[in-house]
Amino acid sequence: MKTLETKKAPAAIGPYSQAKMTGNFLLASGQIPVDPATGEVAGDKIETQAEQSCKNVGAILEEAGLTFDNVIKTTCFLADMADFAAFNAVYEKYFTSKPARSCVAVKQL
């Protein structure tokens, strides 16, 4: 099993890794909308935050030699389901292969 870390995505803030890979199977930790260059949350709009989160996922995939087309399942957490359509507009630009997905609201995000 290989631990993956990249400076192109936010560093883990706890006792976990950005991702683990075994064979061709990658499990990535959840990605928040933090710009790894600044350590700051990317804006205050859902579109900007979704874009940054997707860029962070992309950086981890790249480190593993994978692309968004290799993703088979995602789990998305929104602070407010009213942002669902705006989030999807960004999400579908990255996840064009339409992986299986769960999306829920978590009020304390």
Task: Give the location of each predicted region.
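Short, polar/acidic, helix-capping and beta-turn segments at strand->helix junctions
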Residues: 1-109
